[in-house]
């Protein structure tokens, strides 16, 4: 409300009437394991198997964890039903942790492209669990010109490389 930020990139479904939301990017969360993990031999696990797998997840309040909670809720599964070994505060810390553990992580597919390409991690499908989220540009209503508009054009042009 103090007009200090011309443009923001946000995740989530919260909407305020004085702000303009422009869809930018869809992201998928996936289950990953290190290729030295015993879970490497699996291509897909069930929701019941997910309850038994040791997990390392993002911290409470993170958008990533919120998307997981929402997806699990659709199947009447709570976080407390899972075998959570640890909550960590960043994507990079989860990736480092997974390199030396038998745990599974839930992260954005976009955050692990390099590791998938190098063969460090493998994506495991979780049968019937869909985890997508949207990112939107946000700006004050009527403030859709100038440098913010130019940046949005630039970002939209190059978003497939993200």
Residue spans for each PLM region:
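Residues embedded in well-ordered beta-strands
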Residues: 30-32, 38, 54, 104, ...
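Hydrophobic hinge/microswitch elements
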Residues: 1-4, 10-11, 73, 77-122
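Short beta-strand->loop
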Residues: 20-30, 116-131
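Short beta-strand-centered segments that line the small-molecule binding cleft or hinge
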Residues: 1-29, 33
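Short helix-loop capping/hinge motifs at secondary-structure junctions, enriched
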Residues: 36-46, 142-149
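Alpha-helical segments flanking ligand/cofactor-binding loops in enzyme cores
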Residues: 22, 48, 95-96
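Secondary-structure junction motif
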Residues: 55-76, 145-146, 162
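A late-sequence structural motif
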Residues: 124-162
């Amino acid at each position: 409300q103090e007009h200090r930020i011309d443009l923001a990139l946000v995740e989530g479904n919260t909407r305020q009437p004085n702000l303009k939301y422009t869809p930018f990017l869809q992201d998928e969360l996936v289950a990953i394991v290190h290729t030295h993990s015993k879970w490497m031999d699996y291509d897909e696990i069930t929701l019941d198997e997910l309850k038994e797998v040791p997990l390392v997840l993002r911290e409470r309040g993170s958008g990533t964890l919120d998307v997981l909670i929402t997806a699990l809720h659709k199947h009447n599964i709570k976080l407390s039903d899972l075998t959570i070994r640890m909550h960590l505060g960043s994507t990079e810390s989860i990736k480092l942790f997974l390199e030396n553990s038998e745990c599974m992580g839930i992260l954005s597919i976009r955050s692990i492209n390099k590791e998938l390409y190098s063969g460090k991690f493998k994506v495991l499908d979780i049968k019937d669990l869909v985890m997508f989220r949207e990112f939107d540009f946000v700006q004050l209503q009527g403030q859709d010109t100038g440098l913010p508009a130019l940046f949005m054009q630039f970002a939209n042009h190059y978003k497939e490389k993200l």
